[in-house]
Amino acid sequence: MIYFDITKTGSSGHRSGLMRVSSRLRQQLGAAATEVIWHRGALKRASDKTALTFTPSDWFLTSELFSEEERPGFANFLASRPCQLAAIYHDAIPLKHPHITWPQSVARHPAYLKLLSRFDHVWAVSQASREELQGFWLWLGTDGNPPVEVLNLGADFDGSARLTTPERPAASSGQPQLLCLGIIEPRKNQSMLLETCDELWRERLAFELHVVGRVNPHFGPPIVARLKMLQREHGSKLQFHEGASDERVAERYAAARATVFPTLAEGCGLPLLESLWRGVPCVCSDLPVLRENADGGGCLPVAVNDFASWKIALRRILTDDAFHAQLRAEAVSRPLPTWAEAACTLLRGLGV
């Protein structure tokens, strides 16, 4: 039996990348998994909060972030090893970028990474994350660390069929549309994107930018304030869709000429994969973690946070029809991972 941890994801009202990973894996694991939560110092069945009886062949599987402070007694649970332990590791962004990360996340992360070393098996969401985690353990000097393999996350984010024909986007306004998805915060770097688009609009380049995402209440308001200021100046060329449903997001994909992903740091970069699933080329930051998927085609990597390079790249994707058609053809024809395949990888690794 796989006991699948939904302590946070089962009650969360927003749809972050971590929530997406948990929900899609849970769907694909189906009857092989039972949902559990950490409740009052013990792991319990999520449906009725009853106690669990483990056998040595059972697995506890979590894709969540945790600490002893958030889950009193969890460290003792790991030490007692009532069953086998497996985890999915995302990234060390709170340690690498503490100035733009929730203080609670920054405080939690060192202990979280250390607790991961007590598991029997860990999957990292990218090769970059795998090397990152192993490097942290090496620096920390932990002994008996578990094997870490790469789990390729799915591109089929909402279970929809993949677009496999290079159709042209249906932009109702007649102007090409760029789509930027992700939480509004400094790490996602919408500020640089807004300034780049502002300059292109001032140079009379006709296009729309659609920004979709919830606002990080700690870091997002200044970005939203700048966005609204530019909206007053440029009107309908800049549109903000906060908290859009999956259906609204699908509409935006259908109208998009390209997605733009100027992020400063990622564990995997699901927006890139999800864009390709929709057959939409992605202009993305030239991060090693994103290159793991971008190099397969359909993407235009651009130097991280380089205003001049992004301006050139956006102008090219908006005006060079032959280049855009090439990227679209690559996007719809290249192989892409699915959540069903990710679940199969886990089942094989767990021997279930």
Regions found by a protein language model. Give the residues of each.
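Carbohydrate transferase catalytic cores enriched for Leloir-type hexosyltransferases
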Residues: 1-352
